[in-house]
Amino acid sequence: MGASEELEYLKSLVSQLNGKIAAIEAKAKGSPSPTPAQQLRTILIGPPGAGKGTQAPKIRDEFCVCHLATGDMLREQVQQKTPLGIEAKKIMDAGGLVSDDIMVGIIKDQLENNKSCKNGFVLDGFPRTIPQAQKLDGMLAERKEKIDSVVQLLIDDQLLISRITGRLVHPASGRSYHKEFNPPKKRNVDDVTGEPLIQRSDDNVETLTKRLRTFHSQTGPVVDYYKVKGLWHGIDAAQSPSVVWENLRSIFVSKK
């Protein structure tokens, strides 16, 4: 973590602590604790293995918003053979990258047709570039909406590699577990469905090192874009999932 990034993280940490102090003081005085905002529109940024798959469902459930994981949404559109899915499949079959316009269109489709998005959303996996961030802002502006927070999960690459090489996934739902840090209740079996878990073929050191290098090169400018807007918050994702969650929640509650 560079000096400037560490400074920004410490500022964000102070903000989180102030929110916790306010909540404790209110409780001590017998006043009601701060409650979540009625609308939450947040972006969760973090490299593979940082804990997005663990934390995003908690945000969804706590704040009654939808979890928009762009990879899952794209696969769903392709499987359902929607107009956007058909167009995306043609591009992917030709070896191309799905355009920013299609990805923003898929997000827009969810916001318009997914009832669980009525209170807002947590966006996971998008945007990855400044043009994508700008197109997302434009689409939301047309809906008279805007992003209200961007949270980056900060963690050392070596710790990430150890996390990911032990990761287990439920293919149908995308639920993720870890052999050591977040094991399923029954070994190699999904807690909800009882179906078998798998380890992704690309969850190996060589592939992960390349993915992390790409992530860092892409994410830096996007993070700076949101820092300028005053929306960025950094959280130490090396902490236990429960501590990370409390820090996340304090950010969203303080936005009320």
Curated annotation (Swiss-Prot):
Residues 166-203 are annotated as: LID. It catalyses: AMP + ATP = 2 ADP. GO terms for molecular function: adenylate kinase activity; ATP binding. One of its GO terms (cellular component) is cytosol. It is an enzyme of class 2 (transferase). Residues 69-98 are annotated as: NMP. It comes from the Eukaryota. One of its GO terms (biological process) is ADP biosynthetic process. ATP binds at residues 49-54, 167, 176-177, 239. It holds the Pfam family ADK. It is found in: Cytoplasm, Cytosol; Mitochondrion intermembrane space. InterPro entries: Adenyl_kin_sub, Adenylat/UMP-CMP_kin, Adenylat_kinase_CS, Adenylate_kinase_lid-dom, AK2, P-loop_NTPase. Catalyzes the reversible transfer of the terminal phosphate group between ATP and AMP. Plays an important role in cellular energy homeostasis and in adenine nucleotide metabolism. Adenylate kinase activity is critical for regulation of the phosphate utilization and the AMP de novo biosynthesis pathways. Consists of three domains, a large central CORE domain and two small peripheral domains, NMPbind and LID, which undergo movements during catalysis. The LID domain closes over the site of phosphoryl transfer upon ATP binding. Assembling and dissambling the active center during each catalytic cycle provides an effective means to prevent ATP hydrolysis. Belongs to the adenylate kinase family. AK2 subfamily. NCBIfam families: adk, PRK00279.1-2, PRK00279.1-3, PRK14527.1. This is Adenylate kinase. It comes from Laccaria bicolor (strain S238N-H82 / ATCC MYA-4686) (Bicoloured deceiver).
